Amino acid sequence: MPALKPTEFMGRVVWLGVNQDRAAALESTSRDVLSLPFGGPPEESHSGVTRRSCSRVSRQYPKGTEIANTRQVSIVSEEDLALIAQDMGLARIEPEWLGVSMVVAGIPDFSLIPPSSRLQDDASGTTLVVDMENRPCHLVSAVIERGYPGIGKRFKPAARNRRGVTAWVERPGEIALGATLRLHIPDQPVWPHLATARNG
């Protein structure tokens, strides 16, 4: 029995990019096509089948532990970027500032899509698996602050539940600008004890 449900929610790819040297800078550089082998975009600083654990999994592993890399790609929505900019009092938030790999348009509340959802290119079948919601961080605030002094600190509250998701490659291939990604979601109910677990 299939465990994933194709939906009619479609995302159009409106921006692609890579961050080639995370140690040097957070910002990403735009691309027309993203090559996606199993390890993620080869040029991307977050690529690889494994990675070193970071703050997002600090309660599970000591920092620097080698773990499977479920953070190969960072995806945000055009709609969420517009809302972040609006709340910050800016005309626009550029995807480069966030160091993202991809911007999609057309999927509402994109940052809250369920973990383990798939984003599948309708034409090529290239598929990304959503790991989890991304979290706003002070590093983006610092990038914005350089261009807009006094504004950078507004990023974290404005980007709460709008920072997009992290994902990894399940079926390799390429995704190009203008591609259409269909959202597939896990066909299971919400765990009844979720609120208790979160508050415990």
Where are these predicted regions, by residue range?
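Glycine-rich active-site loops that engage anionic ligands at enzyme catalytic sites
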Residues: V104-P108, L112-R171
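Electropositive, beta-rich accessory/interaction domains or terminal extensions
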Residues: M1-R118, D122, M132, P192-R198
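Short, well-ordered loop/turn sites that connect or cap secondary structure elements
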Residues: I113, E174-L177, L181-L183
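Short, Lys/Arg- and Gly-enriched loop/turn segments at beta-strand edges
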Residues: V129, H138-V140, D187-G200
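Short, surface-exposed secondary-structure boundary micro-motifs
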Residues: S124, E133, T180, P186-D187
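Acidic/glycine-rich phosphate/pyrophosphate-binding loops and surrounding catalytic core
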Residues: G147, R154-F155, A167, T180-I185, ...
